[in-house]
Swiss-Prot record:
Keyword Aminoacyl-tRNA synthetase annotated: no
Superkingdom in the source lineage: Bacteria
InterPro entries reported in the protein's UniProt record: NusB-like_sf, NusB_fam, NusB_RsmB_TIM44
Species classification: Bacteria, Pseudomonadati, Spirochaetota, Spirochaetia, Spirochaetales
Any Gene Ontology biological process: DNA-templated transcription termination
GO cellular component: cytosol
Chain's role: Involved in transcription antitermination. Required for transcription of ribosomal RNA (rRNA) genes. Binds specifically to the boxA antiterminator sequence of the ribosomal RNA (rrn) operons.
Name of the protein in its database record: Transcription antitermination protein NusB
SUPFAM superfamilies: NusB-like (SSF48013)
Length: 142
């Protein structure tokens, strides 16, 4: 599923960078990575849930990121980091992977190490780990 998360991150980043409406550029059947088996319905579903779910919940996701990253405005964050964070927050908060919350953070870190700046993975780990701790303690926003 790592490849699917990478493609979803790239789509989320692309939508944000191009400031386009998702309907204008989102075509689930036109994935550029030929190595992804888009005939597999569960892969298609996972990909679309990551992208569409992130944007459907963007206001809440951004609010959670703002609450944790007190000294960083979203506008100041690197767009790559922001796309990874948004997808990670969506996965932690809205997807039902109770037994693999740490794996979601690990995936985000791997993506940050490949696509982010030198220290992106540390920043992303800090934000997502803080969110997970808040969720586990019941103090994060609903």
């Amino acid at each position: 599923m790592h490849e699917v998360r990478v493609l979803a991150f790239q789509k989320i980043y692309s939508i944000d960078i191009n400031q386009s409406a998702m309907d204008d550029i989102f075509d689930i059947f036109n994935i550029e990575d030929k190595d992804l088996d888009i005939e597999n319905e569960s892969i298609k579903s996972f990909y679309s849930s990551l992208v569409i779910g992130t944007f459907d919940n963007l206001e809440h996701i951004d609010s959670l990121i703002r609450d944790i990253s007190l000294n960083w405005s979203l506008e100041r964050m690197d767009k790559v980091d922001l796309a990874i964070l948004r997808m990670g927050v969506y996965s932690l908060k809205f997807q039902n992977f109770e037994n693999s919350k740490r794996a979601i953070i690990d995936e985000a870190i791997l993506i940050a190490k490949k696509y982010g700046s030198k220290n992106s993975y540390k920043f992303i780990n800090g934000i997502l780990d803080a969110l997970l701790k808040n969720m586990e303690s019941g103090i994060e926003k609903k």
